Amino acid sequence: MDRLEIAIGHQLGDLTIDLELGVDPGQTVALLGPSGAGKSSVLRAIAGLLQPARGQVHLGAHHWFDAAEGINLSPDERSVGLVFQDYALFPHMTVLENVEFASADAAPEILSRFGVGELARAMPSSLSGGERQRVALARALARDPDVLLLDEPLSALDTITRREVRAELAGLLAEVPVPTIVVTHDPVDAADLADNVAVMDGGKIVQVGTLSELRGSPQHITVERILGPAESDER
């Protein structure tokens, strides 16, 4: 397994994306920030859905993107598993067929691994929020990706379902051996799903650390706005 390294710059309208980030194998990093901070654009750049104006995206010694060298692998050439906020399952396919779309050989085993093997013949419309998430994650991992990217995976759920699914997803991500990035605007999601949190604002990462570190010593006004002021040792 290799470390993911991102150092990109890009202009999107009035937003200037300029950041560096590294994610180790088996580590989950949350990109936490307000809407419009550029979080999802970072995922798109990693996946090859957005070509930055400058910078690099490397996975170990493998160069997925390097503006100076003229390297820009297509999305199909990058080993990335993607899970979007609406889970994007094919509605006309069964659960098994959805996962087989990524890998026919791996589908039965990975459905069983994620606890939804008995739903193989079910249609997506009949699934609960947690079941849909498990199937989407199974499909993303069926192709044995080297990087896993999740874009607001819990935002479409109601409060009660969100709490239950968050706990399930945290357990699943703890077993994923590849670099993983989760985009979220919710500090609770970030705390439960990620090892480290990178707070973004205005296209830049303004502070990185565990949630307790960020809460204990916020270094940017956006960190304070999201997490509150530094906690006092006094009682």
Q: Where are the language model's segments positioned?
A:
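ABC ATPase NBD coupling module
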Residues: 64-81, 214-218
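A short, proline-enriched helix->beta-strand linker immediately N-terminal to the Walker B motif
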Residues: 142-146
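Catalytic Walker B motif of ABC-type/P-loop ATPase nucleotide-binding domains
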Residues: 148-152
